[in-house]
A protein has these predicted regions:
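Conserved nucleotide-binding and Mg2+-coordinating catalytic segments in signaling enzymes
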Residues: 27-45, 62-75, 84
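A short glycine-centered flexible hinge/capping loop motif at secondary-structure junctions
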Residues: 71-79, 104-105
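Catalytic-core segments of nucleotide cyclases and related cyclic-nucleotide turnover enzymes
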Residues: 149-187
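Heptad-repeat coiled-coil signal-transmission/dimerization helices
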Residues: 43, 47, 82-83, 87-90, ...
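GGDEF/GGEEF active-site signature
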Residues: 87-150
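Nucleotide second-messenger and two-component phosphorelay signaling modules
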Residues: 29, 48-58, 62, 73, ...
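Short, conserved catalytic or interaction motifs in soluble domains
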Residues: 72, 113, 175
Length: 187
């Protein structure tokens, strides 16, 4: 290859490498490295599209109960393992009709198309998420408070309103003596 051809090819090779690197970084930024779920940014774009397409969407906000205690008692590796298992259980529940994400820390989010028996589905989610986690020969207690919002019941279908309503429902669930129960609130 002569020097003139090399001089022409080098910038193209540089741009191709740079584009590949940016594509990889963008994909990585949209996936949580610990759980593999979508990050807030990756989840939000898909959730907004889902709300526009599916009037029957349900937004869920989930928070692990007493997660700090689990971390302090059993160690951060055990806490990370509990987060990964929770993410797997949530993703399995969402299946093909929903999208799960991790907002950060011990908070998760999901959007799903409403099934005719959604209350039963929320109960099955609660049961699945509140199962102990087997870690290093121990059974770690895991419980999750779940808040939900039926988008069709909002005056204006928006993701921000649905998340705010699901957040209120989640804290109402945390405030109950039993916790661990799904709550649905709508304005």
């Amino acid at each position: 290859m002569d020097t003139q051809a090399l001089a022409l090819a080098l910038p193209l090779i540089g741009w191709a490498s740079h584009t590949a690197l940016l594509t990889h970084r963008l994909a990585t930024a949209r996936r949580d490295p610990l759980t593999g779920l979508r990050t807030r940014a990756g989840w939000t774009a898909l959730a907004e599209r889902s709300i526009r397409r599916h009037r029957d969407a349900v937004v869920l906000l989930l928070d692990l109960d007493d997660f700090k205690n689990l971390n302090d008692t059993h160690g951060h590796a055990a806490g990370d393992f509990a987060l990964v298992v929770t993410a797997e259980r949530l993703a399995a529940w969402c299946g093909r009709n929903g999208i799960a994400g991790r907002l950060g820390g011990d908070e998760f989010v999901a959007i799903a198309r409403q099934a005719p028996d959604l209350d039963l589905d929320l109960e099955s989610l609660r049961r699945a998420l509140n199962q102990p986690v087997a870690y290093a020969g121990r059974r770690l207690p895991v419980s999750v408070s779940v808040g939900s919002c039926h988008v069709k019941d909002l005056p204006v279908r928006s993701l921000s309103d649905a998340l705010a309503t699901a957040d209120s429902a989640m804290y109402a669930a945390k405030g109950t003596s039993g916790r661990r129960g799904p709550r649905t609130l709508n304005r």
